[in-house]
């Protein structure tokens, strides 16, 4: 039997929109997603998916449920089959128990009761309360995150409320000595940070001591409820803001999270004293947010940022790294009133790929030609994880970092790596915080292809042999007007007069090939979400992959 805690963890981790959109075409509508119901015939969309709450409901036929129930209904699977299918898809390990089904309601209730005892103790301990306030925490924040304190009086509270001590030992609240088998408080004399599941249930604690010789932070031990390698501190309060802002700030400490929330950055979370791992990714990816790593600039912080960036870059996640130098961290900046400076820094992260390449270069003695050669091989090996377009974007950066001739990297034109900044803002520290310039936008590419066709309409016969108007997302009307020879169309005239569309002799075929490539790359994303039968999806995906391979080898492929 699959443990209930394992089922809960799966439901809390997976994104219901990602699950359902692989079966049904969803469109955003306010805070929800809508579609025509897959469980009954209808013409107008009445099937609603709530990403934040993790459920779907059809206002037409009444079908409703969570991700598991949807997969069961759509694929006609049993409960266990649907669970195992989702776990396999999202790389989540299910735990099985051969014994009787076990409900964790009592465990959650016990931890909530203990958390309440800790909270009461903190407000009866002026010294510890003053410490937190001196660190910049307001009373409202202390209450919102339900901070507490573990003192000897907690023993009395446990006895007085008749809480199950054996259970509390299992849950890591109490320990038992090896010698006399007496119980003791594991978090004695520590400020307590309750740690919640994504569904806002207490699953464990982090404890901070003010004593110098003891370990500064300790967490609850691993249990059926508490897995520090997959939990994120503050996520239960941040998740709605993450979905709305499409951005998540990952920090290193509990206090960083609380102070960031207090300063208005309510999309901040933290790992539980561990590095970011693949086990965190399913939860971190929910809602497809931009991921900002906000780490200390010391050696440990740089190493953690490097390992996380390697993982996130290979996962093709949007976002980047912000390192805080001179022993600063977000908590310090907020406490010092530097909120605007912090906001500016968070607006200009260094992209994951760029950060990795710079760290790789820094790890070699580049005055030594042999070391430089090793660095080049490592950096190019890393770039092989990405598309040819991305590789071409970052090769000039490698040449700059290694002071290597451009032709060594296969670069013919005299180009250099150009970080991109939004036109509305100018960062204070461009040498550290940069967005990498992306490949030409699809809209620009569509304009360029149509401009070539306007300048030389004999190319139109070539073009229509390979493409149709469905290739264009932004300039479909202009292409249709051109095919219908409506050359006085104002939009076509505007393109003809656009001075920002550089044409090169013999360049049309290259741009046409790139436009077709973009089309098939979109198909790879859209086909799995279509309503086609599984066998047809596989055929279409295979065709798209073959086309992409030929296009990258320089062939033109008809759509």
Swiss-Prot record:
By its UniProt entry, which SUPFAM superfamilies does this protein fall under? Answer: DNA primase core, Zinc beta-ribbon
Q: Which Enzyme Commission numbers does its entry carry?
A: 2.7.7.101
Catalyzed reactions: ssDNA + n NTP = ssDNA/pppN(pN)n-1 hybrid + (n-1) diphosphate
User: Zinc finger (CHC2-type) locations?
Assistant: 37-61
Which keywords does this Swiss-Prot/TrEMBL entry list? DNA replication, DNA-binding, DNA-directed RNA polymerase, Magnesium, Metal-binding, Nucleotidyltransferase, Primosome, Transcription, Transferase, Zinc, Zinc-finger
Q: Which SMART domains match?
A: TOPRIM (SM00493), ZnF_CHCC (SM00400)
The cellular component terms of Gene Ontology attached to this UniProt record, alphabetical and capped at eight, are: cytoplasm; DNA-directed RNA polymerase complex; primosome complex
Matches recorded under Gene3D superfamilies: 3.40.1360.10, DNA primase, catalytic core, N-terminal domain (3.90.980.10), DNAb Helicase, Chain A (1.10.860.10), Zinc finger, CHC2-type domain (3.90.580.10)
Which residues are involved in binding Mg(2+) 2? 296, 298
Domain of life where this protein originates: Bacteria
Summarize where Mg(2+) 1 binds, as residue positions: 252, 296
Q: Give every Toprim domain span.
A: 246-327
* Pfam families, per the entry: DNAG_N, DnaGprimase_HBD, Toprim_2, Zn_ribbon_DnaG
Task: Name the cofactor(s).
Answer: Zn(2+); Mg(2+)
GO biological process: what's one of them? DNA replication, synthesis of primer
- Relay the cofactor remark from the entry: Binds 1 zinc ion per monomer. Binds two Mg(2+) per subunit.
UniProt-recorded Gene Ontology molecular function terms: DNA binding; DNA-directed RNA polymerase activity; zinc ion binding
Q: What is known of its domains?
A: Contains an N-terminal zinc-binding domain, a central core domain that contains the primase activity, and a C-terminal DnaB-binding domain.
Q: What family does this chain come from, according to its entry?
A: Belongs to the DnaG primase family.
Q: Which PANTHER family match?
A: DNA PRIMASE
According to its UniProt entry, the function of this protein is described as: RNA polymerase that catalyzes the synthesis of short RNA molecules used as primers for DNA polymerase during DNA replication. Stimulates the 5'-3' DNA helicase activity of DnaB.
Complex formation = Monomer. The C-terminal domain DnaB-binding domain exists as a dimer in solution. Interacts with DnaB via its C-terminal domain (residues 415-559 of DnaG); up to 3 DnaG fragments bind to a DnaB hexamer.
What name does UniProt use for this protein?
DNA primase
Q: Which organism is it from?
A: Helicobacter pylori (strain ATCC 700392 / 26695)
């Amino acid at each position: 039997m699959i443990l209930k805690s394992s089922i809960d963890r799966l439901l809390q981790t997976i994104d219901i929109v990602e699950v359902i959109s692989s079966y049904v075409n969803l469109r955003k509508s306010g805070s929800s997603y809508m579609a025509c119901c897959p469980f009954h015939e209808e013409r107008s969309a009445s099937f609603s998916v709530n990403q934040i709450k993790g459920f779907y409901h059809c206002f037409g036929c009444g079908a409703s449920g969570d991700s598991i129930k949807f997969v069961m209904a759509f694929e006609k699977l049993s409960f266990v089959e649907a669970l195992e299918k989702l776990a396999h898809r999202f790389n989540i390990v299910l735990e099985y128990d051969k014994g009787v089904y076990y409900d964790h309601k009592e465990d959650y209730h016990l931890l909530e009761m203990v958390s309440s005892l800790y909270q009461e103790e903190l407000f009866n301990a002026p010294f510890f309360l003053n410490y937190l306030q001196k660190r910049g925490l307001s009373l409202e924040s202390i209450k919102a995150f339900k901070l507490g304190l573990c003192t000897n009086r907690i023993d009395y509270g446990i006895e007085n409320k008749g809480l199950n001590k054996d259970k509390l030992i299992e849950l890591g609240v109490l320990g038992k000595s090896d010698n006399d088998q007496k119980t003791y408080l594991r978090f004695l004399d520590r400020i307590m940070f309750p740690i919640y599941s994504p569904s806002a249930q207490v699953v464990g604690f982090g404890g901070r001591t003010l004593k110098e010789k003891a370990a500064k932070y300790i967490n609850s031990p691993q249990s059926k409820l508490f897995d520090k390698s997959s939990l994120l501190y503050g996520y239960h309060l941040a998740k709605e803001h993450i979905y709305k802002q499409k951005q998540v700030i990952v920090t290193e400490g509990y206090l960083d999270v609380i102070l960031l929330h207090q300063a208005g950055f309510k999309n901040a979370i933290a790992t539980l004293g561990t590095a970011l791992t693949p086990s965190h990714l399913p939860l971190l990816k929910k809602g497809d947010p931009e991921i900002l790593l906000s780490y200390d600039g010391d050696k440990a912080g740089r190493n953690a940022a490097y390992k996380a960036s390697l993982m996130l870059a290979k996962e093709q996640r949007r976002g980047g790294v912000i390192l805080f130098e001179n022993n600063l961290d977000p908590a310090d900046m907020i406490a010092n009133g530097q909120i605007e400076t912090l906001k500016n820094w968070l607006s200009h992260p260094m992209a994951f790929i760029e950060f990795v390449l710079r760290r790789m270069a820094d790890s070699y003695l580049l005055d030594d030609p042999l070391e430089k050669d090793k660095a080049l091989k490592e950096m190019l090996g890393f770039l092989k994880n990405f598309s040819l377009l991305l590789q071409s974007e970052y090769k000039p950066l490698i040449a700059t970092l290694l002071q290597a001739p451009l032709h060594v990297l296969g670069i013919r034109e005299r180009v250099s790596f150009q970080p991109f900044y939004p036109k509305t803002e100018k960062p204070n520290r461009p040498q550290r915080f940069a967005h990498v310039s992306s490949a030409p936008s699809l809209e620009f590419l569509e304009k360029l292809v149509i401009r070539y066709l306007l300048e030389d309409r004999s190319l139109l016969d070539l073009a229509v042999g390979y493409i149709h108007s469905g290739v264009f997302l932004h300039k479909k009307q202009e292409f249709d007007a051109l095919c219908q020879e409506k050359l006085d169309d104002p939009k076509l005239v505007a393109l003809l007069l656009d001075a920002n569309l550089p044409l090169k002799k013999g360049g049309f075929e290259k741009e046409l090939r790139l436009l077709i490539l973009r089309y098939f790359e979109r198909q790879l994303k859209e086909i799995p979400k279509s309503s086609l039968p599984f066998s047809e999806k596989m055929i279409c995906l295979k065709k798209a992959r073959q086309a992409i391979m030929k296009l990258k080898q320089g062939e033109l492929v008809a759509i």
